[in-house]
Amino acid sequence: MKSIKLFYDKILNNIEKINPHLYRFLTYNLYKIYSEIANSIKYKDKYFFHSVSLEISTYCNRKCHYCPNKDYETPKNFMSWDIFKLAIAQLKDIKYTGIVQYHLFNEPLFDERLTDFVRYTSTHLPKAIQVLISNGDLLNIEKAKELSEAGINKFVVTVHDTNPERNLERLKPVKEFLKEKMRLQTSNELYLASRGGAADIEKEKRKTDFKKCPDIRTLIICYNGDIILCCQDYFKKYIMGNIMEKSILEIWNSYKDIREKLLRDNITELPICKICLKRE
């Protein structure tokens, strides 16, 4: 299954070179269809999470114009090894084979334990696809090789400068080394969301107005073990539970009705969702 996903990803990378818009469409829609079919069979739930984001730390070195970090100082908190291992163990219990990422609003490369985390995930979730989302400021060939060997399957690096040419040039050798494993983009290519109202992006050109939430099917595990509603909940107002008190599966199923209303019925009830999906 993992080899099929990676082969599919390789094809999409080639499509992106020809037509970036088609790439975005296929990335979202084809993977959505595939994951819904697979999860319906495996978990009897078409909306089961296909991606997990582990907030291994809260620190980011950037103050990007579209991110709430530019307006708020975030304390430097780090996920403990005990919580990390518990999260991986619970994912292993349900035979999880989806995507594992190491970010929320943080820059993963600033955590010196990242390679060890990746290696641990590779050992205990060998069929999962590990993705590094990064601003690339600390990424070089040596670090890319280290992380790739530890188990990172895909590097997605976004250059956040207003004039990104310099950093794009700096990262070219890394891209040449990683080849199809790395997706290099600028912040101009991102879809912008208001982070549930925490970021003011009205002055920016929003790339997409989503009819349905694209993020509610990602499981977010915060540094302290809290599971929050989605990756747009910057202030962590909607805490669904904590993995040290209940299992991931119990917590995920506890707000199934919210997901189904959003994804199946297109009904938006929570204030954060109304703001994010522009339905105020």
Which residue ranges define each predicted feature?
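Conserved AdoMet/S-adenosylmethionine-binding subsite of the radical SAM
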Residues: 111-217
